[in-house]
Protein backbone atom coordinates (compact mmCIF):
# COMPACT_ATOMS: atom_id res chain seq x y z
CA UNK A 1 0.00 0.00 0.00
CA UNK A 2 1.15 3.53 -0.78
CA UNK A 3 2.62 5.16 2.32
CA UNK A 4 2.04 8.86 2.95
CA UNK A 5 3.45 11.28 5.51
CA UNK A 6 1.35 14.28 6.57
CA UNK A 7 3.58 16.86 8.27
CA UNK A 8 1.07 19.49 9.40
CA UNK A 9 -2.46 19.84 10.74
CA UNK A 10 -5.19 18.48 8.51
CA UNK A 11 -8.96 18.42 8.96
CA UNK A 12 -10.20 15.26 10.71
CA UNK A 13 -12.64 14.36 7.93
CA UNK A 14 -9.98 14.80 5.26
CA UNK A 15 -7.59 12.63 7.27
CA UNK A 16 -10.25 9.95 7.59
CA UNK A 17 -10.82 9.95 3.83
CA UNK A 18 -7.10 9.64 3.08
CA UNK A 19 -6.77 6.79 5.57
CA UNK A 20 -9.29 4.78 3.55
CA UNK A 21 -7.00 4.67 0.53
CA UNK A 22 -3.45 4.87 1.88
CA UNK A 23 -1.22 3.97 4.79
CA UNK A 24 -0.92 7.32 6.54
CA UNK A 25 1.57 8.54 9.12
CA UNK A 26 0.12 11.73 10.58
CA UNK A 27 2.68 13.84 12.43
CA UNK A 28 1.26 17.35 12.55
CA UNK A 29 4.43 18.78 14.11
CA UNK A 30 6.91 17.06 11.80
CA UNK A 31 7.44 20.35 9.96
CA UNK A 32 9.37 21.56 13.01
CA UNK A 33 11.74 18.58 13.02
CA UNK A 34 14.12 18.73 10.08
CA UNK A 35 16.18 15.83 11.42
CA UNK A 36 13.10 13.60 11.41
CA UNK A 37 12.27 14.56 7.83
CA UNK A 38 15.82 13.94 6.61
CA UNK A 39 16.00 10.52 8.26
CA UNK A 40 12.47 9.21 7.70
CA UNK A 41 11.35 10.63 4.35
CA UNK A 42 12.94 7.76 2.41
CA UNK A 43 10.23 5.34 3.58
CA UNK A 44 7.36 7.35 2.09
CA UNK A 45 5.83 7.32 -1.38
CA UNK A 46 4.13 10.66 -0.84
CA UNK A 47 4.15 13.68 1.46
CA UNK A 48 1.30 16.09 2.15
CA UNK A 49 2.28 19.53 3.45
CA UNK A 50 0.87 22.96 4.07
CA UNK A 51 2.95 26.15 4.10
CA UNK A 52 5.16 25.51 7.14
CA UNK A 53 6.99 22.41 5.94
CA UNK A 54 10.22 23.20 4.10
CA UNK A 55 11.10 20.48 1.61
CA UNK A 56 14.47 21.66 0.35
CA UNK A 57 17.15 19.70 -1.46
CA UNK A 58 18.81 18.61 1.79
CA UNK A 59 15.63 16.75 2.72
CA UNK A 60 14.53 15.61 -0.72
CA UNK A 61 17.90 14.09 -1.55
CA UNK A 62 17.05 11.41 1.03
CA UNK A 63 13.61 10.74 -0.49
CA UNK A 64 14.62 7.81 -2.69
CA UNK A 65 11.06 6.42 -2.86
CA UNK A 66 9.15 9.70 -3.03
CA UNK A 67 6.79 9.94 -5.99
CA UNK A 68 4.59 12.92 -5.17
CA UNK A 69 4.14 15.91 -2.88
CA UNK A 70 0.66 17.24 -2.20
CA UNK A 71 0.46 20.90 -1.20
CA UNK A 72 -2.65 21.95 0.75
CA UNK A 73 -2.65 25.42 -0.76
CA UNK A 74 -1.22 27.02 -3.88
CA UNK A 75 2.14 28.53 -2.91
CA UNK A 76 5.15 26.35 -3.69
CA UNK A 77 7.91 28.53 -2.23
CA UNK A 78 8.50 25.99 0.57
CA UNK A 79 9.23 23.17 -1.89
CA UNK A 80 12.32 22.77 -4.09
CA UNK A 81 10.30 22.34 -7.27
CA UNK A 82 13.40 22.33 -9.47
CA UNK A 83 14.80 19.33 -7.62
CA UNK A 84 11.42 17.60 -7.85
CA UNK A 85 11.25 18.24 -11.59
CA UNK A 86 14.70 16.81 -12.16
CA UNK A 87 13.94 13.72 -10.07
CA UNK A 88 10.46 12.87 -11.35
CA UNK A 89 8.65 13.85 -8.15
CA UNK A 90 5.17 15.16 -8.90
CA UNK A 91 4.23 18.35 -7.02
CA UNK A 92 0.48 18.97 -6.90
CA UNK A 93 -0.90 22.16 -5.32
CA UNK A 94 -4.59 22.49 -4.46
CA UNK A 95 -5.14 25.09 -7.17
CA UNK A 96 -8.43 26.95 -6.81
CA UNK A 97 -9.58 25.08 -3.71
CA UNK A 98 -9.42 28.15 -1.47
CA UNK A 99 -10.33 30.73 -4.12
CA UNK A 100 -13.79 31.47 -2.72
CA UNK A 101 -12.52 31.83 0.83
CA UNK A 102 -9.68 34.17 -0.16
CA UNK A 103 -11.99 36.27 -2.35
CA UNK A 104 -14.46 36.67 0.52
CA UNK A 105 -11.58 37.67 2.80
CA UNK A 106 -10.49 40.37 0.35
CA UNK A 107 -13.97 41.92 0.19
CA UNK A 108 -14.47 41.60 3.94
CA UNK A 109 -11.13 43.25 4.68
CA UNK A 110 -11.82 46.07 2.22
CA UNK A 111 -15.16 46.83 3.84
CA UNK A 112 -13.68 46.55 7.33
CA UNK A 113 -11.01 49.13 6.51
CA UNK A 114 -13.32 51.52 4.69
CA UNK A 115 -15.99 51.32 7.39
CA UNK A 116 -13.37 51.35 10.19
CA UNK A 117 -15.27 48.49 11.78
CA UNK A 118 -12.52 47.47 14.20
CA UNK A 119 -12.04 51.01 15.53
CA UNK A 120 -15.78 51.56 15.93
CA UNK A 121 -16.18 48.19 17.65
CA UNK A 122 -13.43 49.04 20.13
CA UNK A 123 -14.99 52.42 20.90
CA UNK A 124 -18.44 50.89 21.31
CA UNK A 125 -17.09 48.35 23.80
CA UNK A 126 -15.76 51.28 25.83
CA UNK A 127 -19.31 52.63 26.02
CA UNK A 128 -18.77 55.26 23.35
CA UNK A 129 -20.80 55.77 20.17
CA UNK A 130 -18.53 57.64 17.71
CA UNK A 131 -21.21 58.63 15.21
CA UNK A 132 -19.53 61.88 14.17
CA UNK A 133 -15.90 61.58 15.27
CA UNK A 134 -15.06 58.70 12.94
CA UNK A 135 -15.64 59.20 9.22
CA UNK A 136 -16.14 56.08 7.11
CA UNK A 137 -16.18 55.58 3.35
CA UNK A 138 -18.11 53.51 0.82
CA UNK A 139 -16.76 50.77 -1.38
CA UNK A 140 -19.09 51.93 -4.14
CA UNK A 141 -17.32 53.90 -6.85
CA UNK A 142 -13.83 52.90 -5.78
CA UNK A 143 -11.12 51.58 -8.11
CA UNK A 144 -9.87 48.11 -7.25
CA UNK A 145 -6.43 47.16 -8.54
CA UNK A 146 -5.68 43.47 -8.92
CA UNK A 147 -2.08 42.30 -9.07
CA UNK A 148 -2.32 38.96 -10.85
CA UNK A 149 -5.46 37.94 -12.70
CA UNK A 150 -6.03 34.26 -11.99
CA UNK A 151 -8.81 32.28 -10.33
CA UNK A 152 -8.86 34.24 -7.07
CA UNK A 153 -8.88 37.65 -8.75
CA UNK A 154 -11.82 36.57 -10.89
CA UNK A 155 -13.69 35.46 -7.77
CA UNK A 156 -12.98 38.84 -6.17
CA UNK A 157 -14.24 40.53 -9.32
CA UNK A 158 -17.53 38.63 -9.17
CA UNK A 159 -18.09 39.65 -5.55
CA UNK A 160 -17.33 43.36 -5.92
CA UNK A 161 -19.47 43.82 -9.03
CA UNK A 162 -22.51 44.48 -6.82
CA UNK A 163 -20.71 47.45 -5.27
CA UNK A 164 -20.29 49.29 -8.58
CA UNK A 165 -16.50 49.06 -8.33
CA UNK A 166 -14.18 49.73 -11.27
CA UNK A 167 -11.58 46.98 -11.63
CA UNK A 168 -8.17 47.32 -13.21
CA UNK A 169 -5.49 44.63 -13.25
CA UNK A 170 -1.81 44.03 -13.87
CA UNK A 171 -0.68 40.61 -15.08
CA UNK A 172 2.07 40.24 -17.70
CA UNK A 173 0.76 36.79 -18.64
CA UNK A 174 -2.83 37.83 -19.39
CA UNK A 175 -3.75 39.79 -22.53
CA UNK A 176 -5.86 42.93 -22.66
CA UNK A 177 -8.47 41.02 -24.64
CA UNK A 178 -8.77 38.36 -21.95
CA UNK A 179 -9.25 41.02 -19.28
CA UNK A 180 -11.73 42.98 -21.35
CA UNK A 181 -13.85 39.82 -21.58
CA UNK A 182 -14.18 40.08 -17.78
CA UNK A 183 -14.89 43.83 -17.94
CA UNK A 184 -11.46 44.62 -16.52
CA UNK A 185 -8.95 47.09 -17.94
CA UNK A 186 -5.35 45.91 -18.22
CA UNK A 187 -2.89 48.51 -16.90
CA UNK A 188 0.77 48.69 -15.94
CA UNK A 189 2.07 48.08 -12.44
CA UNK A 190 2.73 51.79 -11.90
CA UNK A 191 -0.75 52.70 -13.15
CA UNK A 192 -2.31 50.50 -10.49
CA UNK A 193 -0.26 52.27 -7.82
CA UNK A 194 -1.40 55.68 -9.09
CA UNK A 195 -5.06 54.87 -9.76
CA UNK A 196 -6.28 52.20 -7.37
CA UNK A 197 -8.02 53.00 -4.09
CA UNK A 198 -7.58 49.37 -3.05
CA UNK A 199 -4.87 46.97 -4.20
CA UNK A 200 -5.25 43.21 -3.84
CA UNK A 201 -2.26 40.96 -4.55
CA UNK A 202 -2.79 37.48 -5.94
CA UNK A 203 0.53 36.17 -7.23
CA UNK A 204 2.71 33.23 -6.17
CA UNK A 205 5.80 33.92 -4.09
CA UNK A 206 8.87 33.30 -6.25
CA UNK A 207 12.08 35.06 -7.26
CA UNK A 208 10.15 37.43 -9.54
CA UNK A 209 7.53 38.46 -6.98
CA UNK A 210 9.58 38.47 -3.77
CA UNK A 211 9.99 42.06 -2.56
CA UNK A 212 7.55 43.22 -5.23
CA UNK A 213 6.20 45.71 -2.71
CA UNK A 214 8.84 47.81 -0.99
CA UNK A 215 9.16 51.34 0.37
CA UNK A 216 9.34 53.03 -3.04
CA UNK A 217 6.21 51.21 -4.19
CA UNK A 218 4.23 52.25 -1.12
CA UNK A 219 5.32 55.86 -1.62
CA UNK A 220 3.70 55.84 -5.08
CA UNK A 221 0.33 54.65 -3.80
CA UNK A 222 -2.68 56.83 -3.12
CA UNK A 223 -2.57 58.04 0.46
CA UNK A 224 -6.34 57.87 0.96
CA UNK A 225 -8.79 55.29 -0.42
Label each residue range with its predicted role:
Residues 1-91, 194, 214:
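An N-terminal-biased, well-structured beta-alpha scaffold segment characteristic
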Residues 15, 34, 56, 103, ...:
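A general structural signal for well-ordered alpha-helical segments in protein cores
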Residues 22-29, 46-48, 123, 175-182, ...:
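Short, flexible loop segments at the rims of nucleotide/cofactor-binding pockets, characterized by
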Residues 31-35, 50, 71, 93, ...:
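Residues at secondary-structure transition points
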Residues 77-83, 117-129, 164-168, 173-175:
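Mobile beta-alpha loop/short-helix "lid" or hinge segments that flank ligand
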Residues 87-89, 94-143, 151, 158-162:
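Phosphate-binding beta-alpha-beta segment of Rossmann-like dinucleotide-binding domains, i.e.
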Residues 132-223:
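Rossmann-like dinucleotide/phosphate-binding beta-alpha-beta segment
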